[in-house]
Amino acid sequence: MAELKEKLFSEFAPVSTEEWMAKITADLKGVPFEKKLVWKTGEGFNVNPFYRAEDIEGLKTTESLPGEFPYVRGTKKDNDWKVRQNIEVTCFKGANEKALDILNKGVTSLGFIIKGSDVNAENIATLLDGICPECVELNFNTCNCKAEMLIGILADYFKGKGADLEKCKGSVNYDPFKKPLVKGKENENWVEAAAAVLKAGAALPGYKVLAVNAFYFNNAGAYISQELGYALAWGNEYMSQLTEAELPAAIVAKKIKFNFGISSNYFLEIAKFRAARMLWANIVASYNPECLRDCENKGPNGECRCAAKMKVHAETSTFNLTLFDAHVNLLRTQTEAMSAALGGVDSMTVVPFDKTF
């Protein structure tokens, strides 16, 4: 293994930070360095135009490895992500045909948006006909009041097809905070309802059933720090309220999925996903989640570190899509998707460039 401080290009004399600053100051010809080259972000901190190895000395995160707590560099050892496309279901047969078509074109994750009144076993069977639930990540967005019912229908359908439920991966987007967030109306008794959904979700071990839809903030123009802060507070509210309702912390944490937006702020978006995983890992660890199976991924006090892994889906922003030169949106969504990929998300959706039309 190469040494971290191995000297490369030793034939060139080292240049100190002071020498760099002297050269930059001379080239600026009197223009203040802070004014011309320091990026003052909306998040409240300044970004310098160059950094040196000395700037990261003492940072523990530089020693983190992929798949290791606190998951700064990802919750797994590779950086594979799923390509997800959402389908708004108006005709279940037509949606099934659309799903099969895009799967053959390379999509690896499907998202179905279904009206609550349409949730029944017959429609779900039509929708999923010919789709292997063990091979394709399946995600469902429907009315909160039908989430528990939908989970039961899916579990029965997968069993009927002889699928291994441990291998079936996906999510049901139960979101008790959308109503107060988007409509300003209080959602009473959400803890009891969320607990019922969580208990129903035990039938689908590989499914996340509690959603943190942080993309609402992103699409409303929030700064990255605001989106991240609200998302973590949202996730912590699940943990706090449901553990008080005597549900195990490990079970609650493992059923939460974070859905972030992706803005055009390339480097800070990469940092956002890395910071989100690290912060969430520490939040979950503070609840001392008990390991529910024989596993080597434990903390110093025996707490479950698998529960501290953040499941992240990301979707390119709609806040900055333009109507007037729509093909510019192709460039924006491209850079947004790239930052999410480098940031280590588990799946992503790139919205159509003409979505605003």
Which stretches of residues belong to each language-model region?
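Loop-rich catalytic cores of soluble enzymes, especially ATP-dependent carboxylate-amine ligases
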Residues: 263, 270-273, 319-327
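Catalytic alpha/beta active-site cores
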Residues: 1-265, 269, 290, 295-298, ...
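Short, well-ordered amphipathic alpha-helical segments that serve as non-catalytic structural scaffolds
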Residues: 238-241, 279-283
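Extended amphipathic alpha-helical segments enriched in small hydrophobics
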Residues: 269-281
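Structured mid-domain segments that build the active-site/substrate or prosthetic-cofactor binding neighborhood
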Residues: 282-287, 298-301, 311-321, 335-357
